[in-house]
Amino acid sequence: MKISREKGKRAERQWRDEFRAHGYAARRGQQFSGSPGSPDVVCDDLPMYHFEVKHVEHLNLSAAMVQARRDAGGKAAFVAHRKNYWPWLVTMDAERLYRLFQRDLTGEWATRMAAEFSPAQACGEVDWVHCQIITGRRLNIHEAVAQARREAGRRAFVVGHQDRDGRWLVTMTSETFFKFLRGELPPAN
């Protein structure tokens, strides 16, 4: 148990360092067994974001998102995750991706998204991002990200997938995530 706890702390420090490398002040959260006031990593520049950090070889992404949502206390839930020898990935609810696209979630666009609410539909309207959709099989997120990277060419890429309850999730590299945060990717059409 001590080894896995130390691995968790190390992962939290690494994710904190990712924030710092991208110009955000961040620190490890106060750990109180997953209470809403204790995200794994706190970024004062993003007070409405809750980050659950995982460093495991075989992550149950659905369970991690359930935990992140539960612990988020009304904030936007994200799972920052990686496995050995892979870069950091960030997974979020699809609606959060639309907000990162700086889309107005009202009006005609929201009505169309509510009908399908799939990342492919949103990404289909944005020519500078490739959205790889994975359905109908057990998800290996790292294989899906590698495939999306190959197919995207020079475009940004995300992987859309559904959790065990059918909710759409989106996973992207931390590099893409931080570019979205800084607004460095082209705006939506």
Across the structure, where does each feature detected by a protein language model lie?
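Catalytic phosphate/metal-binding cores of nucleic-acid and nucleotide-processing enzymes, i.e., regions
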Residues: 1-189
